Swiss-Prot record:
Pfam families: PapZ_C, RapZ-like_N. This is Nucleotide-binding protein Csac_1160. It comes from Caldicellulosiruptor saccharolyticus (strain ATCC 43494 / DSM 8903 / Tp8T 6331). The keyword ATP-binding applies. GTP binds at D62, I63, R64, G65. HAMAP family: RapZ_like (MF_00636).
Length: 293
């Protein structure tokens, strides 16, 4: 009998759970939306007894469940005590992005009745309710800057049947502090102490992926010393995180605008991780935004 694989999809309203569940359908999962958490163990039990007709389940559990959602944490604790093979996926986005999405779709937030119709207040109330649940997440995806296609590709990367379930998913990303911290980062490194190519006229409109910018960023003694210490730390952490059972590791490198220094350092770190035999992906979150350094 195949061990049932279950993905619990949760997170902020407006962060993309509906898009996610459609992506899971495309991957061959049996999908359920707006499932009361108390029903999950029974459904997993029935699926396990289906003679392998159902081997993968994805279920969305969120605050639409009302009072039933209050037992979600207890259900997760009970599942952890059992033999269930499950992962928790938490989708998140910055508050201003969620507000904008609600305005564009003209839909009501599930907690709008508790907040006198204020979308932002409803989002903040939901964030408080989900604070403890987020700690159970095996995977956290910040969808603030992701298109529907980007999100689908990210989910395929994590959950496709071809990916080894024993492999920790490592993502190296660059970002600009002026656009906000990435919500899904496990480790954040600030490289704004490195001399900034933005103030070199011939480099201002290039990115950290281009040779001239790379050479500028990497030539400084402070950069060389930082990379040595960073490489030692990351190569120490990866096997220890994997041993602990961590499923996802997101390493974020930030500079002011996310186009120059952070991009170069992220590229260097990505190559180091690959060259040491680990599977990794790289994502430059803000590289296409207006150049401000």
């Amino acid at each position: 009998m195949i061990l049932l694989e279950t993905v619990i999809v949760t997170g902020m309203s407006g962060a993309g759970k509906s898009l996610a569940i459609r992506a899971f359908e495309d991957m061959g999962f049996f999908c359920i939306d707006n499932l009361p958490p108390q029903f999950l163990p029974k459904i997993a039990e029935l699926a396990s007894a289906s003679n392998d007709k159902i081997s993968r389940i994805a279920a969305v559990i969120d605050i639409r469940g009302g009072e039933l959602f209050d037992d979600f944490k207890d259900v997760l604790n009970d599942l952890k005590k059992g033999t269930y093979n499950f992962k928790v996926l938490f989708l998140d986005a910055h508050d201003n992005v969620l507000v904008q999405r609600y305005k564009e779709t003209r839909r009501k937030h599930p907690l709008s009745f508790e907040s006198d119709g204020s979308i932002l207040e409803a989002i903040q109330k939901e964030r408080e309710k989900l604070e403890d649940i987020k700690r159970y997440a095996d995977f956290i995806i910040d969808t603030s800057t992701l298109s529907p296609r980007d999100l689908k590709e990210k989910l395929f990367e994590i959950f496709s049947a071809q990916r080894s379930r024993e492999t920790m998913l490592i993502t190296v990303m660059s970002f600009g502090f002026k656009y906000g911290l990435p919500l899904d980062a496990d480790l954040v490194f600030d490289v704004r102490f490195i001399p900034n190519p933005f103030y070199v006229e011939e480099l201002k409109h290039k990115t950290g992926k281009e040779k001239e910018v790379k050479e500028y960023v990497l030539k400084w003694d402070v950069t060389k010393e930082f990379l040595k210490k960073l490489f030692d730390l990351i190569l120490f952490l990866i096997p220890n995180y994997a041993e602990e059972g961590k499923a996802q590791l997101v390493i974020a490198i930030g500079c002011t605008g996310g186009k120059h220094r952070s991009v170069t350092i992220a590229e260097e770190l990505f190559e180091l991780i690959k060259n040491n035999g680990y599977k990794a992906s790289i994502f430059h979150r803000d590289i296409e935004k207006d150049i401000k350094g």
